[in-house]
Amino acid sequence: ERGVPAAEVPPGPQAEEISPAQLAQQLDEPGTVVLDFTTSANFVARHIPGAWWLTRSQLRQALDVIPPAQRYVVTCGSSLLARYAVPEVAALTGKPVQLLTGGTLAWIAAGLPLAHGDSGLAVERRDRYRRPYEGTDNSAEAMQAYLEWEYGLVDQLARDGTHGFRVL
């Protein structure tokens, strides 16, 4: 035996599963909505066309934005985490919920079409840390000037001599 043993995964909720090929056929007809519980970065990079991105913690708010459906299919990269959303989606919608077998990775492996970009974000992307300057209109030069000023504070304090601070 080598390395760290694989972590045991507790059994997830039971879920009716649907294959990527079956889902592709269902998506040709109205009534099916795909809910993708992957990371927002993964979703923006590639997702099933027409899918909606959301997090379980914002499921109720997301369902206010997502058009109602006759049935829902949940996925994530592998569908391991999406499985845990099945009973929650069913309870909140009162509609049948299926789990995509193998997740979005199985969809990709089957050579089925993909969409890219941030259309389909049902909730705000709050699933990752954003640096304070990300998403602002501050130029790189302005950010660099601020950092240089901040790094220069130690020298400025050393020259001042009236403050009583000592650099450790």
Model-derived regions, located:
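Rhodanese-like catalytic fold shared by cysteine-dependent sulfurtransferases
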Residues: E1-V33, F37-L168
